[in-house]
């Protein structure tokens, strides 16, 4: 009887020991992975949504655009290699929080709500939200969008602005071009997207037009994880230097055909 009790105790001890060893190895693996991410000082990870021409879009399988070249300049000034993670726009801030990316450079407008969850750089572009309608539409301003069906890109300030319109039925899409395709197909009454992408994409839809008066005005900035002031300061320094030495104006000329920021 005593022998059986001893064996049971030994088995229990062995089980507990094996369990503790397994837990220790799991914790070690997690710490090693976290350490490898935090110590990977040669890489700067940019998160973006490459459906936002001319700021970020794909050309020959590569993500290119105004924001990409801005991020490349920041990485170069820091002595790092830029790595780009293309993801859904509404997944960018969660990716910052989890440490999947170092910064979100995606034509992201600064809002009080976003500032609760992220740290922003100095603004680098003045933008606005534009209303797009069919050329034969009688809609001429934001007030005539009341009780209309409006297509937007999910998680954007255009999405937020449209949602505030009285009685509006907002239809969300993963990318701005999808919203315009829905409008061109006659499935919605209007679309609301940012001004620069609107001008780029509407040129491919002969049946659509942009209403002159903007729905709202805003500023684009780079988003960082809360508390990452060091990286934000690096970005601010690069942006300021680019504006001072003409590189910023050269980017505007390359992607917008003018060396001046376009007025909202």
Task: Describe these PLM feature segments.
Residues 17-31, 157-174, 209-214, 237-264:
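Ligand-binding clefts/hinges and TM-proximal coupling segments of bilobed small-molecule sensing domains
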